[in-house]
């Protein structure tokens, strides 16, 4: 059963501008694993940060609660398996909500344009 569908899009340049202006934004929004992954992308890192930001926003739209209930962006971890397929791992309040609502499988697709 599909619990919900969420879609989000953001301009990569917007994420780049915010991150260059406020280093705390990165640490508040992204997990250590996401930061490590994106930082390996050198010239294209902001594209990868933007894709993860949008995936987190899309997930919250799919759940239908918005950012209430104390869920933090960093409670949502976007990672890749050994084949490069993206997945979502929930922790903290996001996991509590998922467990309460009874959804365990989350599908995600990431897209971005070159900056």
Residue ranges and their predicted role:
Residues 1-115:
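Core catalytic alpha/beta fold that binds nucleotide/phospho-ligands
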